[in-house]
Design a protein with these regions (language model features):
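Mid-to-C-terminal catalytic subdomains of enzymes
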Residues: 2-10, 35, 171-216
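C-terminal catalytic and target-recognition region of SAM-dependent MTase-like enzymes
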Residues: 220-228
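Surface-exposed, low-hydrophobicity interaction/linker segments
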Residues: 8, 12-18
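ATP-dependent adenylation/nucleotidyltransferase module used to activate substrates
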Residues: 1-2, 16-183
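A short, terminal or domain-edge coil/loop segment
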Residues: 142-147, 212-213, 217-220
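Short secondary-structure transition/capping segments
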Residues: 82, 124-129, 204-216, 226
């Protein structure tokens, strides 16, 4: 059950809420939203996890009174993407680390932004860093594996310990469906190997969930070979 927040008494002459990121996040916290589970942009607030964020319709109405110009995005698809991504990031991110971000990658920006509050990380686009974001998506990961097999190179499944992979188990279809719905530029596959793509398209028809299974099998075989 939501509490109805009267925030008028919380503001003084020296405590007006402006349009800065700091003020918006402070206001959200005051009305009971857990900002570790939302992604902030100046124009939109994206809910990553509705339950954990506690960003109810009542709290949204309170928020919109203060910030009518900021849209609250409740996309269930985006929440599913965040859930998939968090399974990787929870294991890969080191608290308080500096993370080098890719340029012009809107979906990665959205996924990584909450970790500045969850783990105290600093997102950088140049200069010194501890970890680097690899924007590898699930489709390219699978196509890389198939390409290596077809070329006789083996699994071609490698990951760098200094890299993190927020999109490694998120499909191109999910990503572009969300980006299109949100009015953003779509992304493309990096791996354009024709044989790998054709085989992936064939498997799409007969076993739509194959991608996760291919990656899981490759991880198992890689670990097995490393221990022998």
């Amino acid at each position: 059950m939501d509490l109805i927040f009267d925030v008028s008494g919380l503001k003084s002459e020296d405590d007006e809420f402006g349009s800065s990121k700091k003020d918006v996040l402070k206001y959200l916290k005051i009305i009971g939203v857990d900002t570790r589970f939302i992604s902030y942009t100046p124009e939109k607030i994206y809910i990553n996890n509705l339950r954990f964020s506690k960003f109810s319709r009542t709290r949204e109405a309170t928020f919109k009174k203060q910030y009518p110009e900021i849209e609250v995005v409740r996309s269930k698809l985006f929440q599913k993407i965040c859930s998939k991504s968090s399974k990787h990031l929870a294991l890969e991110i080191e608290p308080n680390s500096a993370i080098l971000m890719p340029k012009d990658n809107y979906i990665v920006d959205l996924l990584m932004e909450p970790y500045t509050r969850k783990y105290g990380v600093k997102l950088v686009y140049e200069g010194d860093y501890d970890l680097i974001v690899n924007p590898l998506i699930l489709d390219d990961q699978v196509n890389n594996i198939f390409e290596g097999i077809f070329k006789g190179e083996g699994l071609n499944y490698t990951k760098n310990d200094k890299e993190i992979y927020p999109l490694a188990n998120v499909s191109l279809d999910w990503i572009n469906s969300f980006l299109e719905m949100d009015g953003q530029e779509l992304i493309k596959n990096e791996n354009e190997n024709e044989l790998a793509k054709s085989f992936s398209e064939f498997l799409d028809e007969v076993a739509p969930q194959y991608r996760d299974n291919v990656v899981s099998a490759s991880e198992f075989l890689k670990n097995k070979l490393e221990t022998e």
